[in-house]
Amino acid sequence: MTSLAVLLTLADSRLPTGAHVHSGGIEEAIAAGLVTGLATLEAFLKRRVRTHGLLTASIAAAVHRGELAVDDADRETDARTPAPAARHASRSQGRGLIRLARRVWPDSGWEELGPRPHLAVVAGRVGALSGLAPEHNALHLVYITMTGSAIAAQRLLALDPAEVTVVTFQLSELCEQIAQEATAGLADLSDPLLDTLAQRHDERVRPLFVS
């Protein structure tokens, strides 16, 4: 498989990692009246890409290049993810990705990562094994950060899929910029709003999405 094919496969929403059950905070944002249509969805996606997307991609890029050991990467992710619910969601998605990765690369020492690693840590190892360039691995993570929330909003608000796709096309340049920034070094930021949404969603009775 070429690196481009790997990139497309990892960015495919049909990848069987369980990511489709996570909304990235958009369900709670809609419930709170913060996202009501396309304009507010675009604003939310920009905010999420610039914070969570950048953070996840930067840690993955460091693991990918071998600059950050997996134990250190796990601790760095915890330190940059204040909300327990957000940490749980990250580890849940990491578990889904590592389950798939074990099937694709069965002899690659996955035990080192433990049973529930953060998504960024697994993604960094996967990127290195698959032959992706670090910037392309970062881009795929930024991209799925955006599209995961966009697709969830489309379902929850019954938005026109074509209109939502237009929004994601308009944010493609931002995704490229954030991916480049992620490869420059570890991001050191969090977003209190996204952390609050994650915690409130975790307390919700029978939500449609896990996070």
Swiss-Prot record:
It is found in: Cytoplasm. InterPro entries: UreF, UreF_sf. Keywords: Chaperone, Cytoplasm, Nickel insertion. It comes from the Bacteria. One of its GO terms (cellular component) is cytoplasm. Its main location: cytoplasm. One of its GO terms (molecular function) is nickel cation binding. Residues 71-93 are annotated as: Disordered. Required for maturation of urease via the functional incorporation of the urease nickel metallocenter. UreD, UreF and UreG form a complex that acts as a GTP-hydrolysis-dependent molecular chaperone, activating the urease apoprotein by helping to assemble the nickel containing metallocenter of UreC. The UreE protein probably delivers the nickel. Belongs to the UreF family. This is Urease accessory protein UreF. The lineage of its organism: Bacteria, Bacillati, Actinomycetota, Actinomycetes, Mycobacteriales.
